[in-house]
Amino acid sequence: YKRQMDKYAFMDALKAGKFNHEKIDVIFHEGACSDTMEYNGKYMMENNFEYTKNVLHFCLDRKIQMMYASSASTYGSGAHGFREEPACEEALNVYAFSKLFFDNYLRRLLPQAQSQVVGLRYFNVYGPQENHKGKMASMIYQMYNQWKAEHKVRLFGEYAGYGPGEHTRDFVYVKDVVKVNFYFWDHPEISGIFNCGTGHAHQFNTLAKAVLNHFGSGELEYVPFPEVLKGKYQSFTEADDTNLLAAGYDGGFTPIEEAAEEYCQLLDKTGGYYVYEG
C-alpha cells in the first residue's frame, strides 16, 4: 500500500482540498461501520452516510468514477424479494438504515450525475484480508478459528422456522467481489445500484461442513439463538442478479466448496493474508 491514512485524516485532507490537484481515475469506497449491533445512530450516520456523501460529491465534482459498498442488509427479511428497488427494501437495524439512506440519496442525484457511480449491495462476503474486522469477519473465518481453539465449530440453533444451522445466506467470495468491482471500473458508462452475490443461497451448515472437511475432524455444536438478535436477523438472503447480468457482468462466481477450501488453505499458510513474495 502507498500513502495509507487514517479514515479521519483522509476526510480532513479531502475537505481541505489536499487531493484537488491529484490525478485520480477511480475511488473504491469500501469502508464503513459494518457492525450490525451498533446502536449509536449518530456514529453510524456520520461514518456510513455523511462520510460516503463527502466522497461522492468529491467524485461528482471532478468526474471521478466511484464504486462504493452498499449492503444486502437493506433488504431486511427479504419477504418482498432481493431486487434493487424500493418495494423490496426494509432495514432491520441501524447499519442497514444508514446504507439504505445513502442509496436513496444517490438515487435522487443519479439522473444529473455526469460521471459513473456504482453501489454494490454485498451479500455475505468472505475471504482473505479480513482479520482486522474482528467479530464482523465472515463466519468461515470465525469457524476456522473456533476449530483451531477448540476442535469444534458453533452455529445458531433453531429460530424463525429454520432448524439448527439452517439459516441461509448468499455467501460470495471476496475474489469475485473484486471481479465485479473491476468490471464496472472497465465500464464507466454504467451507473446504478447492483446486487453483488452469487444468486445461490447456502445454509450455514454447508460452511461449517466445509471447515470440518478441511481439518478432517471436529464437532459441530449448536447454541441457542441470541435474544438480542431476534427481530434484527436476516434468516435468508439470496441475490437477484438480474440487473447485474443485464449490465453485462459474465465473470461468474466461485462455488462455495472450492472457495472455502482455498480460503482455509490460505488461513493455514499465512493466517488469511496474501503476502508479497517478490
Protein language model features and the residues they cover:
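Short-chain dehydrogenase/reductase
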Residues: 45, 91-100, 133-141, 170-171, ...
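Glycine-rich "substrate-gating" loop/helix at the edge of Rossmann-like oxidoreductase active sites
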Residues: 92, 123-137, 158-175
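NAD(P)H-binding glycine-rich loop region in Rossmannoid oxidoreductase-like domains
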Residues: 7-47
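C-terminal substrate-binding subdomain of Rossmann-fold SDR/epimerase-dehydratase oxidoreductases
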Residues: 147-278
